[in-house]
Design a protein with these regions (language model features):
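Bacterial N-terminal signal peptides that target proteins for export
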Residues: 2-11
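Bacterial N-terminal signal peptides
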Residues: 12-21
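Glycine-rich cofactor/substrate-binding loops
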Residues: 23-47, 86, 100-103, 287-507
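A helix-coil-helix interface module used to build multimeric assemblies
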Residues: 24-207, 212-218, 282-285, 298, ...
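Short, well-ordered beta-strand elements within core beta-sheets of diverse protein domains
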Residues: 51-59, 172, 243-251, 375-385
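Conserved hydrophobic residue
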Residues: 59-60, 272-274, 386, 408
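Short, solvent-exposed positions on alpha-helices
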Residues: 62-66, 108, 257, 388-393
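Charged, flexible cofactor/metal-binding loops and thiol motifs
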Residues: 122-127, 131-138, 142, 149, ...
């Protein structure tokens, strides 16, 4: 009995390994640290800053400032207990302050409104998530760049209109996506400049009669400055921001799905040259078809990226056809799509780390079709002054001849080329009677590696240009990493200063 049970377990083990993580639950996401950095947290930070600034500016007495600080801290301490109520809007937060500090504490609300405060909270929360997205995108781009560098010499077929078109370096192909994702990072940086401006002091839309120090408030909250026009700050930009973020999310999602589909088409082949390593939740098996190793993380990332596109378009529809001042399309902080965007970026990073690339199989695939035919026409013109269209006609006839006989470029002989050429030359008086190409020239024109070597323009897959592009991409990536860290550090330092100054006020 024991032997039978052991045998059953051993037979099941390969299936469990293949299943990886597809039918088992994904690892649980790490619990958010407590207390969370939610609306309650940021309303607390705004109240701290208001109390400090208004005391310093003599809008509150020193005694009031200290007393109000104690009440604010009492509310924050109570809300930090597990299971405690953490009000998320101004009108439900304020009663807690009144209970802790009496009605006088509402003096800190002079010149403020739920509108500028909650807009500020939403921006602060999205800002934090945007910097996390930036870090994730940098990490994924670095993975992609390293993969491209490792496969500069891997020759692959590239496709246009779904048909094998030209040979290329896998490194060159991947560098194009590095450029694409670095443009996405540039969009994030540009959006961050517009996002990271403080609305505080706009009140509702026309400011306030209280001489609030908007610049100090902006500095305490880690902003780069103030959103100057108070109507724009409170009513126009909050509707515009989700649309711009939606455009960034859409661009990232489309780059994801494009790259995923380049990989997915290989899964239709019995012998792919690029696929996912099995196990670790990358693939999963079929319950009915033993041969299948379904590309689970590709499917999941594509689905989530496509869903993200729908959410991004939804941002525009929410803001469409409403006047400023309506809440329909406003920036919503934690409910915006930045987290979803970060999720698909992290998924793509995992995909790139899981790729199993077979250079020999890629070259075999390349040599099964006539992607070299344009090079034959090019060499005819470059070396023998044959008009391109005449050379193109000759190369096209080679393809027709070879495909009819199931001949690949590797097996196509010089004698067969001469045979095709004579038929073409017989009806084209502008052509020499004999094939001007030498056997060596024809062989080199059919060689994918030779085609890559012979590229002569800036930005091509030839080695010298690849080194330039690798260096440029690395420089851009390093600059993006530095920008993200600097932005994050500025926010952290502002928060440290605010908390330290508030502690001093408490004393």
């Amino acid at each position: 009995m024991k032997k039978k049970k052991l045998k059953t377990i051993l037979l099941a083990l390969p299936l469990l390994v293949l299943l990886g993580g597809a039918y088992f639950p994904e690892p649980a996401e790490a619990a958010e640290p407590w207390p969370p950095r939610d609306n309650f947290f940021w309303l607390g930070q705004i109240n701290k800053a208001s109390d400090i600034i208004n005391t310093d500016e003599n809008l509150l007495t020193k005694e009031e400032g200290r007393r109000f600080a104690a009440a604010i801290q009492k509310v924050l301490d109570a809300g930090s207990q597990k299971g405690a109520e953490r009000p998320s809007v101004v009108i439900t937060f304020e009663p807690f302050l009144i209970k802790a500090g009496g009605p006088d504490i509402t003096k800190i609300h002079a010149g403020r409104s739920s509108q500028d405060m909650l807009t500020t909270v939403s921006i602060l929360r999205q800002r934090e998530q945007l910097l996390q997205l930036s870090a994730a995108l940098n990490q994924m781009t670095e993975t992609l760049l390293n993969l491209a560098a490792a496969h500069e010499g891997t020759l692959i077929p590239n496709y246009t209109n779904g048909v094998q078109a030209q040979p290329n370096s896998l490194g060159h192909f991947l560098l194009a996506y590095v450029d694409a994702y670095e443009r996405d990072q540039e969009r994030i940086k540009e959006y961050y400049k517009r996002l990271n401006r403080s609305p505080m002091g706009a009140t509702v839309l026309n400011g306030t009669g209280w001489p609030l120090n908007r610049d100090r408030m902006a500095a305490y909250l880690g902003f780069d400055g103030i959103a100057y026009n108070t109507y724009d700050a409170g009513q126009v930009f909050p509707q515009e921001a989700p649309i711009e973020m939606g455009a960034i999310a859409s661009s990232i999602a489309i780059h994801n799905t494009s790259l995923i589909q380049e990989i997915m088409q290989q899964y239709a082949q019995p012998r792919p040259w690029i696929l996912l390593r099995e196990g670790n939740g990358n693939t999963y098996v079929s319950s009915a078809m033993p041969q299948k190793r379904n590309p689970g993380i590709l499917n999941r990332c594509r689905t989530d990226s496509s869903t993200l596109l729908g959410l991004a378009v939804g941002e525009a529809f929410r803001a469409h056809n409403i006047p400023a001042g309506m809440a329909d399309g406003r920036i919503r902080g934690n409910d915006d799509i930045v987290k979803d965007t970060t999720n698909v970026v992290n998924q793509m990073n995992r995909i790139l780390q899981a790729l199993d690339i077979k250079p020999e199989r890629a070259l075999e695939e390349l040599n099964l079709d006539w992607t070299c035919s344009q090079e034959i026409a090019d060499v005819m013109m470059r070396k023998h002054n044959i008009p391109f269209r005449s050379g193109h006609h000759f190369a096209s006839e080679i393809v027709t001849f070879a495909r009819a006989r199931n001949i690949t470029p590797v097996d196509f002989t010089y004698a067969q080329a001469q045979e095709v050429y004579r038929k073409v030359a017989a009806v084209d008086a502008s052509l020499p009677k004999e094939l001007p190409l030498t056997p060596e020239e024809l062989k080199d024109a059919k060689d994918p590696a030779g085609i890559i070597r012979n590229r002569a323009v800036k930005g091509g897959p030839q080695h010298n240009e690849m080194q330039i592009m690798f260096a440029n991409a690395r420089n851009v990536l390093n600059a993006n990493i530095t920008w993200q860290k600097n932005a994050e550090n500025k926010v952290k330092n502002a928060e440290i200063k605010l908390n330290n100054d508030f502690i001093r006020l408490l004393r």
